[in-house]
Amino acid sequence: SADEAFNGSMGSDEGVDLANKFFSVTCKKGMTEDIAWKRLMNIAVTNFENVEVRDKAAGWIKTGWVNTTFTYQIVRTRLEIQVQFTEENELSYRVKISSEIADKDCGTSNQCFSKYDRILRKYESVISELQTSLGSNF
């Protein structure tokens, strides 16, 4: 049988080597923290229904895991965002899309999952939304 999780995801073979790694998003010049926060929260809530941590003062957002079930596997994904202070007084954020995979037979308990170095295609839009709604560089 085809590896559905592999086919439904992107990895370094497609130049998307972002799973389980922090990458930076720098906000457009002049963007306020308020606007950035609203846009980040919007991306988090739209793509991951359950936001577990939303601490505006600390500039930290963390979603709950979202499970995606395939015939033989379960992939779970979550988003974490932390404000990052750069020397140039630029507003930027560290973003991590965590991805883990389990055999469906094992179930959904934490010990069934291991890190998965691919991001499900349905979360590709999260990466582009971060770029377009906040800033440019990665």
Positions of PLM-derived features:
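Ser/Thr-rich, low-complexity intrinsically disordered terminal regions
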Residues: S1-F138
